[in-house]
Every structure is written in structure tokens, then in C-alpha cells.
């Protein structure tokens, strides 16, 4: 059973979440949508405006001769720093983005280079935290897996086995979330938004092995060690150290993975993230025909060929950060 203080904080959280998602609303509208009594809403709105977490709208709403004030989320009450590591056009790229609570970018900068190690990463993050003091959490996307606090199976050798979360938290004294790139991308795709609850994303960089992001029943599927989606370890007799990243070889691997994906997960949508050019319509038709031949009795997944990995990746990382802040954890080290 929730204690009164816990219930109060939960109601505040619900009000802020509704305002962030739906925009400006009056007290009566907030009460109607949340199911919280008007009396309680009045008290909570007062608290939230005093703390500047929400703002009164300048253009209040007219209601039958009276003017009912509307309220909106304060988008700059907290900021989220998103750091994404990615292979982009055959270069290793670090992207630093600062977003407000409405997902509007306050700052975006991309850096590329093979020598961007943990020291350079810490320096850039610290500079941004100093420049944007409203940053309340940092979300980092990596092409690898965090196990036991260390980055494992990393495509970027300079960060392999680094205690990334612990190191950055110690540097800036802020909560740090670390997420796999493909998990973030598939959450970003879901947040476009789309209706499907079962989505698999297959990501094919130009010089590194592929990975997968799995959204099952609306939830990211990670597995016990976070290894779900590490498709480079599939027993398909592929030597990734000497792999020829040609269009034909990538297409052949995708064909196998689409069939395996259907067998393992039976998704509603399969998103193929790649910058390789296949001739989108023809290739998707070929994949669908192959699935139909194997599963003539099944409703087949929609197959989407997308070049928007970077966009979905950032959106997904931001979604992880917003979700963290909305949960209003008081001790982020727990």
C-alpha cells in the first residue's frame, strides 16, 4: 500500500507525464484524464508551479465567459544528455546531444575519429554538463554489452572492458544509463509512434558485424546477460574478422536472419537498418516471398528497409532518459 507521500509523488509524476505527452491542459482536463480529484489536482498544480516543474500558459483557455488557466510542462526544468557511439559512413562517430523534456534539441555535435578514448569522452561530457547545468541524467548508447559493469563485445577497441557507467558517474556526479545501440534504435522506432508491440530490428553497419534489437509485447528483450540480439554469434559459419562487407554477402546474411527471426520471435514487423543499397522494393518482395514459401499458413511480418538508424537510435536513448526522470528516483545509485 502506497504511503501518502508516495501517492502524492506518484500523482505528480502522472500529471507531469500527461502534460508532456498531451500538451497544455486545464486543471479540470488534468483531473478528467488522470482520474485524480479536482481538489487534489489543485494542490499538486500549486506545488508543481512553485517548483517550476510546470508553467502557466500565457494564452489561457476561455470557458463560457470565464478564463480557465491551462498548464504545460516546463521543458527546460531538466535536460537529458544523450551520447551515442556509432559507425557512420565507415567512420567511428560520437554524437553528443542535449534534449529538453519535450525532446527538442538544445545542442547537437558529432565527432569522428579512431582515437576517441574514455579520457576524451569524459572531457566532452564534463564540458557539456558545465555548459548545461540543467542536465539531470546521461544516457549512453554503445555498440556492445555492459556485463558486470564493464563493456563487453565492443566494436570500438578503445572502450572494450571499460567501466563506462561507473567512470562517467564519478566524473560528473550524475546518473548514467548505458544501453545497447540496437535496443535503443528499436525503442526509437516504436516511439515514432507505431502500433506494433512485437518488433525486431536487424542492424547492418558497413564495417562491423550486425546486431539486433528485440521488442516483445512492448518491452525490450535483453536476456539474463543482455546478450539477446548478439546475432554475430549465430552458428551460420560466418568469419566476421574476414567478412567481405559486400552487398551480395550482406543480402545473403539478411535472408538467413529474416527466416531465423520469424522462427524465433514471430514479430509483427522486421526493420532492416542498413546504408547498403539493395533496391528496396524488389528486395523486400523477395524476402516476403521466401517467408511465404516457408510459412504459407502464417500472417507474415511487415518488412521495413530503413536508413534512419541514427535518428531512431537517438530517439530511443532519449526515451530511456525521459522514462528514468519521470520515475523520479531519489537515489539513482540504487
Positions of the model-derived regions?
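ATP-binding/phosphotransfer module of carbohydrate and carboxylate kinases, centering on a glycine-rich
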Residues: 1-58, 62-66, 70-107, 116-127, ...
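Short glycine-aspartate micro-motif
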Residues: 80-84, 137-139, 199-203, 211
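Short, acidic Gly/Pro/Ser/Thr-rich loop/turn segments
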Residues: 88-90, 145-147, 209-210
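Short, well-ordered strand-loop elements centered on a beta-strand within folded domains, enriched
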Residues: 94-96, 105-107, 151-153, 210-212, ...
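Hydrophobic beta-strand positions
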Residues: 98, 145, 213-214
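Glycine-rich phosphate-binding loop and adjoining helix at the ATP-binding site
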Residues: 105-110, 114-188, 284-293
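Short secondary-structure boundary segments
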Residues: 142, 202-206, 274-275, 303
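Glycine/GP-enriched mid-protein hinge/lid loop-to-helix segment characteristic of carbohydrate kinases
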Residues: 174-266
Amino acid at each position: 500500500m502506497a504511503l501518502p507521500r508516495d501517492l502524492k509523488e506518484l500523482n505528480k509524476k502522472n500529471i507531469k507525464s500527461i502534460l508532456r505527452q498531451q500538451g497544455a491542459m486545464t486543471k479540470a482536463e488534468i483531473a478528467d484524464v488522470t482520474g485524480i480529484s479536482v481538489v487534489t489536482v489543485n494542490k499538486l498544480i500549486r506545488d508543481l508551479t512553485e517548483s517550476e516543474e510546470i508553467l502557466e500558459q500565457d494564452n489561457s483557455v476561455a470557458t463560457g465567459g470565464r478564463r480557465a488557466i491551462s498548464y504545460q510542462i516546463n521543458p527546460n526544468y531538466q535536460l537529458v544528455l544523450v551520447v551515442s557511439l556509432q559507425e557512420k559512413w565507415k567512420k567511428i562517430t560520437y554524437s553528443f546531444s542535449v534534449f529538453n523534456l519535450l525532446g527538442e534539441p538544445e545542442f547537437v555535435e558529432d565527432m569522428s575519429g579512431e582515437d576517441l578514448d574514455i579520457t576524451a569522452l569524459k572531457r566532452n561530457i564534463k564540458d557539456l554538463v558545465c555548459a548545461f547545468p540543467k542536465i539531470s541524467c546521461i544516457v549512453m548508447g554503445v555498440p556492445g554489452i555492459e556485463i558486470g559493469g564493464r563493456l563487453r563485445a565492443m566494436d570500438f577497441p578503445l572502450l572494450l572492458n571499460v567501466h563506462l557507467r561507473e567512470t562517467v558517474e564519478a566524473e560528473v556526479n550524475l546518473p548514467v544509463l548505458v544501453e545497447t545501440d540496437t535496443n535503443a534504435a528499436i525503442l526509437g522506432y516504436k516511439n515514432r509512434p507505431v502500433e506494433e508491440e512485437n518488433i525486431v530490428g536487424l542492424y547492418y553497419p558497413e564495417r562491423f558485424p550486425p546486431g539486433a534489437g528485440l521488442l516483445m509485447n512492448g518491452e525490450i528483450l535483453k536476456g539474463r546477460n543482455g546478450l539477446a540480439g548478439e546475432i554475430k554469434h549465430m552458428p551460420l559459419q560466418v568469419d566476421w574478422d574476414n567478412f567481405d562487407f559486400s552487398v551480395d554477402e550482406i543480402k545473403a546474411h539478411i535472408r538467413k536472419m529474416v527466416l531465423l527471426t520469424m522462427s524465433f520471435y514471430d514479430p509483427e514487423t522486421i526493420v532492416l537498418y542498413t546504408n547498403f543499397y539493395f533496391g528496396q522494393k524488389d528486395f523486400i518482395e523477395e524476402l516476403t516471398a521466401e517467408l511465404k514459401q516457408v510459412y504459407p499458413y502464417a500472417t507474415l511480418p511487415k518488412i521495413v528497409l530503413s536508413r534512419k538508424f541514427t535518428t531512431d537510435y537517438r530517439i530511443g536513448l532519449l526515451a530511456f532518459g525521459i522514462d528514468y526522470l519521470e520515475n523520479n528516483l531519489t537515489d539513482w545509485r540504487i
